[in-house]
From Swiss-Prot:
NCBIfam families: gatC. The gene is gatC. This is Aspartyl/glutamyl-tRNA(Asn/Gln) amidotransferase subunit C. It comes from Anaeromyxobacter dehalogenans (strain 2CP-C). Allows the formation of correctly charged Asn-tRNA(Asn) or Gln-tRNA(Gln) through the transamidation of misacylated Asp-tRNA(Asn) or Glu-tRNA(Gln) in organisms which lack either or both of asparaginyl-tRNA or glutaminyl-tRNA synthetases. The reaction takes place in the presence of glutamine and ATP through an activated phospho-Asp-tRNA(Asn) or phospho-Glu-tRNA(Gln). Pfam families: GatC.
């Protein structure tokens, strides 16, 4: 099932993206292909597959670095270019009722 251009426009609006008509057509095709792959995955019988808590087995985890405090942006700087904010938080439209 292909996504309509109207659905792509709605997704872009929620993501606050401005897309050209060419980008809308391109993304409609790309997103439709992704959704088709997900539908194929949903059809797989995974009842015999043991659930995992991580994409890699415990012995295969890559070495993680130690946490280290580093300089970062102040909250005001990080949200300065946001189209809408409340204090130092990004303000976004509710998408889940």
């Amino acid at each position: 099932m292909a996504l309509s251009l109207e659905e792509v426009r709605r997704i872009a609006q929620l993501a606050r993206l401005r897309l050209s008509e060419e980008e809308e057509r391109t993304f409609a095709g790309q997103l439709s292909a992704i959704l088709d792959h997900v539908r194929q995955l949903e059809e797989l019988d995974v009842t015999a597959v043991e659930p995992m808590t991580h994409a890699l087995a415990a012995g295969e985890l890559p070495a993680l670095r130690e946490d280290a405090v580093r300089a970062s942006l102040a909250p005001e700087e990080a949200t300065a270019a946001a189209p809408a904010r409340e204090g130092t938080a990004f303000k976004v439209p509710r998408i889940i009722e």
